[in-house]
Amino acid sequence: EYRRQRQMCIRDSYGTTHADYMYGEIPCARVLTQEEIDAGYEKNTGTVIIETFEGKDPMAVPAVLCKNHGPFAWGKDAKEAVHNAVVLEEVAKMALFTEQLKPDVEPAPQRIQDKHYYRKHGANAYYGNKVE
């Protein structure tokens, strides 16, 4: 089960595009139970997303993959949410191709991930274009 889920989630940042927009792994929410499907599928999909982000900053990783459903992305407004959805799609493709080319690839060093994320999103952010 872990291996199947592993293939659906983007657990590692292999490069700076991922690190520029999302700090850490892009999580994969669990499958809804039959009871959750029967008693409010849409509401419970949202509940499972919230559950997935317990103890995490949802704005540091503004996306989630819902197993057997698909991606969700958000932002401070609709334009940023769409931008984050596009980034998610590109990062997913890059991770897939990277793992196909080199299955034992190592993630980018944490210091590189930190530099790329915090220079755009940290308290002293100085780099990158703001989504307007």
Describe each model-derived feature in a short phrase:
Residues 4, 29, 65-67:
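Short, conserved beta-strand edge motifs with alternating hydrophobic and charged residues
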Residues 9, 21, 27, 65, ...:
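Conserved beta-strand segments that form the floor/walls of ligand-binding pockets within enzyme
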